[in-house]
Amino acid sequence: MILTTTHTVQGREIREYKGIVCGEVVIGAHLGKDILASFTNLVGGRSNAYESTLRETRDGAIAEMIEEAQRLRADAIVGVKFDYSVIGQGGSMMMVAVSGTAVTLA
């Protein structure tokens, strides 16, 4: 499956627009990671625990979107866009959403 943030696939012609596809994953905050992230923020640097979780969450959202495009028999997803939102009471959860347009290529 070809994924691109652009609205075209270089060197290929879009034959048919199949529709909007998306994937969403919500993760909850974890006390251990929060403590580690707080310590990292105090001493400077990056929080590997949060970055790893965010990467896994983003990959899960992409996988959901690809599954939806495959059900539509698409060859590619164009105009891919990511959105990150803090949700839940007190901002206790984060949602990663990805969307794009499923297309077939000539």
From Swiss-Prot:
UniProt cross-references to HAMAP family, sorted A to Z: UPF0145
PANTHER family (alphabetical): UPF0145 PROTEIN YBJQ
Family stated for the protein in its record: Belongs to the UPF0145 family.
Protein name stated in the entry: UPF0145 protein HNE_1325
Organism per entry: Hyphomonas neptunium (strain ATCC 15444)
